[in-house]
């Protein structure tokens, strides 16, 4: 928390033990990290598994995602979170944040609530021509003050 408040950057990426995770074992709720995330972490198992695939939707433009088309490949799951009042949710899946941003103190944070590697992020997502650009844009935004 203090690192972000003093000007640092933080991103939390989805997975089995991030956010709340499997059987709520992630335990990021009510932590110093949650205080500087743009989302609230649930206190229960937050995994939203969709083996059939579910389509992300761009709901708001954000400079970090500039040049990324609105038609994103499907993901197979994500960690369900609740956006904070001051969050900028750029991409949703089933009405939940997939990519969200926030500024806290002198720093910034972001969440990417699906996997960044194959499991919830299938090969079609990870091999998408804009996948690297998403990460570069998020990293640039997080580190530009």
Specify the residue positions occupied by each region the protein language model found.
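Short alpha-beta junction capping motif
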Residues: 1-24, 103-112
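Solvent-exposed, acidic/flexible segments
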Residues: 3, 26, 128-132
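An acidic, glycine-rich "communication" segment
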Residues: 11-13, 17-96
């Amino acid at each position: 928390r203090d690192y972000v408040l003093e000007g640092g950057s933080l991103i939390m990426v989805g997975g089995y033990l991030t956010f709340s995770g499997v059987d709520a074992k992630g335990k990021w709720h009510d932590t110093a990290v949650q205080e500087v995330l743009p989302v609230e972490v649930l206190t229960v198992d937050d995994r939203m598994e969709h083996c059939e695939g579910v389509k992300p939707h761009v709901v708001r433009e954000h400079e970090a995602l500039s040049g990324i088309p609105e038609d994103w490949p499907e993901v197979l799951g994500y960690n369900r979170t609740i956006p904070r009042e001051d969050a900028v949710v750029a991409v949703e899946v089933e009405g939940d944040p997939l990519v969200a941003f926030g500024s806290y103190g002198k720093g910034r944070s972001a969440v990417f609530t699906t996997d960044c590697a194959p499991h919830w992020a299938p090969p079609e997502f990870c091999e998408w021509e804009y996948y690297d650009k998403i990460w570069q844009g998020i990293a640039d935004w997080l580190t530009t003050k």
